[in-house]
Amino acid sequence: MDHFTKLVLRHRLILVTLIGFITLALGYYAWQVEIRTIFTDLQPANHPYVQTNDKYKKAFGGVNVVSIMVEVEQGDIFQLEVLETIQALQKGLQHIDAINQFQIISLASKKLKSVAATSEGFFAEPLMWPGIPRTQAEIDALRTATANNPMASGNFVSADLKAALVTVDFIDRLIDYDKVYPQLKALIANVQKPGMKISLVGQPVLAGIVIEHLPETFSIVIAIVVAILVILLLAKGTIRGMLLPLLSATISCAWALGIVHLLGVNLDPLAVVITFLISARAVSHAVQLILAFDAERAVNHDLSARDAARIALRKLFRPGLLGLATDAGAMAVVALTPIPLLQKAALIGALWLGAMVICTIILVPVLLSWTRVHHEHRILPFRMDPVFNGVLEACSGLATDKRHAATVVIIALTILVGSGFLAKDITIGDANPGSPILWPESAYNQNDASINERFPGSDRMFLVVAGKENDVLKNPGVLDNISRFQQYIEAQPEVGGTMSLADVIRPVNMLMREGNPRFYSVAYDQNFNAELLFLAMAGSDPGDVDRFTDYKFRNGAIQMNFRDHKGDTIRTAIQAIKDYAHLNPMEKASFELAGGLIGVLAAVNEVIFSGQLQSIALALLILFIFCAVAYRSPQAGLFFLPLVLLSNTITFAFMAWHGIGLNINTLPVAALGIGLGVDYAFYIADRVKERFEGGADLAESIHFALSRAGRGVIVTALTMVVSVILWFFLSSLRFQAEMGMLIALWMTVSAITALIVIPSMIHLFKPSFLVGSSTQNTHRQSNVLFMSR
């Protein structure tokens, strides 16, 4: 190690010049990194639900669905101005990018038809197309026709007639949320009239809102950087103590994001919080190196800056590299989850951590070697050392007193068991109705609640009926099974309503029987069902029944609406569908789960549920292996596990208590945080080992470690906790606020564990990889006692 550190500092000018050129080049590309949401990144591609969705979404509807509700303040929607607004929305949506022209459905579309039987035959005509009724008599007739139309009433016109719904599907492969959302907002603004409210919800709207808040996000980032600078300045009072941690974080960021751009990887807007999670590592390691440098200078005033930097690098290279390696290992585990968003997050994290080896662990000591230590200028006249010293003395007092140390370990064990018990209640998926990205009182979530109150639900899932031959969807057994399934699933409180090909056939069959409601059912003859479908589709346009069947009547879909997409809601509905399919098999067809937004979310939740415990176990295994190798002792692998377990169980328990679900948005933070803060313990442990091998007893070694490395732990934790808490107070996005709160909690628990629990464990258990064997330890204590005499 001495040879390596001397080599680094001997060629420091070449090294810094090379790093500078690389930073300029990669920084140029980092500035061009694409920040956008790609919905397919959220989908586990190999999951059967996602494969079903991808196979049938072009016909049956994908995940990018927007619902627009027109609600009147007075009277009902059957007023000329309101009907004009609905028609304007229907026409205006056709000009929005990536729209599926055949899947715009409203009262003003051709797809909602009124079927009538007269002495001259059957007539099927649109309820309100191509024109709208102008006279009061025509409007009254439309009201009556709508109320008697089972496809329109309740689904596209509310039961109280005070609201109308317009739904539209977007083509997944063409949609650009950055363009679509402003176009939707502009359309709403153009058709909005006094006396009515227009509500807008759906995945494209939600993604657009997140993108719209990017300027606010960048403003918060600037505020956080300023907060970090202030805290570092208060902690150290010097230019180098303030700027070097941020400089190392910035350079490593430029390297990582530059390479990410060159690889063609995008950065999701919600992943901005993750960048602070990773940046915390650079700040932490840089602060430890600066404090080690200052400590060497304080002990030996004649020591040159170059020698002090060399010693600091030599002493901290192992714990620093071990900390980065364990973090990288935890992120490598995340990459095993078959969700592109997590794989990209893991790639960014791994690249960033790899860059820190050079940009932090090596660069910071090199830059410190040029410091004019004899002419150090303090910007602030006062120091926070007395505060830090008081905290560290208290920690040392707890850890070096056997009774207190035992109490600390018992309390930590109790908290571990208790938080682990509470953590089991964490919700997989969304824990609350509405979008967890936004606050409950946000306009979007209020609109979503309003739509779900008046209509079957804004979130959709389709269940595929896959036939084994053409025209199977005309088979009476298949149609009867579909009808019975609809009755069964609509009885589930999670499902707001369903629609299928059977809903097209039933009203025509009733009309054939002079309107007798006894015949509101499918026919029991395949040819008769074919005739009923022919009558229903007479005069229809291409795509009118695409939501329910393909043109060969081989594969169909049962469309289901959900009033929320909570994890429990989705799991209960999926299980109910599986139970029905198992008990009601079909000879000529089968049910295939599941498409639409709910189907994709169900797939994500199942992947998270099956993989989260596995990810944590693998991350702990990696921590064990790395520690065992670094300290050449399996005991070391076990010793540091309590810190990681404690921080994780407390964080997950907090999520369960606070109603934060483990979903596709929170999982990257939760997964990347598995190994967060363990480097704190490495620095403490290495300093104990260093002092003990230098001849001190165990209590003095613990005191020394806390006074040196403990100061860095406090500064780093304080810096990151205060800064990320700004997300909570400044962000309009609930997700960012809650993730900031989670990171703050994670850092706090890790810091407390490293400062109190780990030293207490060292004092009680005297691990041999730090203090040698019990015989050596006894001999050491005897020597110290003899010398004291």
Please report, for each region that a protein language model flagged, where it lies by residue.
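Juxtamembrane segments of multi-pass membrane proteins
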Residues: 399, 404-527
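Extracytoplasmic
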Residues: 58, 84, 129-239, 480-483, ...
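Short helical (or helix-break) motifs at transmembrane helix termini and adjacent helical loops
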Residues: 277-298, 320, 326-327, 362-363, ...
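Alpha-helical transmembrane helix bundles of large polytopic membrane transport and channel proteins
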Residues: 18, 84, 88-157, 170, ...
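Hydrophobic, glycine/alanine-rich multi-pass transmembrane helices and their short helix-loop junctions
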Residues: 231, 321-364, 368, 624-627, ...
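Helix-loop junctions and hydrophobic alpha-helical segments within the transmembrane domains
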Residues: 296-325, 691-718
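Interfacial segments of transmembrane alpha-helices in multi-pass membrane proteins
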Residues: 212, 216-265, 336-340, 614-659, ...
